[in-house]
């Protein structure tokens, strides 16, 4: 699939899931912080660290693994919620976007399904969540640029972050 969309999907999921009162979302910043702890602990900087180990390091009970498939429409977005201790799947969900412009709406539907699947107590509250395309943006390129900005900022690259934020 189009790998430039992966960051956009995860950024959109983070924005959507942060609306939950019952889920404690650590987000990309915590992930990058945990990853940095591995790299400063004498590990090779180019070392690939499994997401499960990073989730353990930051104290997460569960973590998300998501991807988007399809180099062109239709796009399939899949999301697994995994138990940090056992790596067992707590939920495995999928949404389809018929065209690129529909990806933010598909992310919103997927986040709503994740919240319900994880037992968010009030289905009404989940349904009242502000869709990504209204809360932030309906533009996938803007989501991707924002994700690049967040990643650059967390890596200490402020000039790159500013450029990416301006593009978003």
What are the functions of these language-model segments?
Residues 1, 37-38, 104-155:
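Mid-sequence helix-capping/hinge segment at a functional interface
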Residues 1-78, 83-100, 124-138:
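Short beta-strand->alpha-helix linker/helix-N-cap micro-motif
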């Amino acid at each position: 699939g189009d790998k430039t969309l992966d960051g956009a999907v995860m950024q959109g999921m983070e924005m959507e899931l942060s609306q939950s009162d019952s889920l404690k979302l650590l987000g990309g910043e915590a992930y990058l912080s945990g990853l940095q702890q591995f790299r400063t602990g004498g590990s090779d900087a180019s070392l690939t660290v499994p997401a499960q180990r990073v989730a353990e390091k930051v104290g997460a009970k569960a973590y998300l693994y998501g991807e988007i498939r399809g180099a062109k429409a239709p796009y399939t977005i899949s999301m697994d919620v995994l138990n940090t201790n056992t790596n067992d799947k707590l939920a495995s969900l999928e949404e389809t976007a018929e065209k690129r412009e529909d990806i933010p709406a598909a992310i919103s539907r997927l986040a709503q399904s994740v919240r319900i699947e994880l037992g968010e107590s009030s289905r009404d509250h989940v349904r009242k969540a502000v869709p990504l395309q209204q809360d932030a943006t309906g533009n996938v390129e803007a989501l991707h640029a924002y994700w690049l900005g967040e990643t650059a900022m967390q890596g200490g690259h402020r000039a790159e972050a500013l450029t990416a934020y301006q593009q978003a």
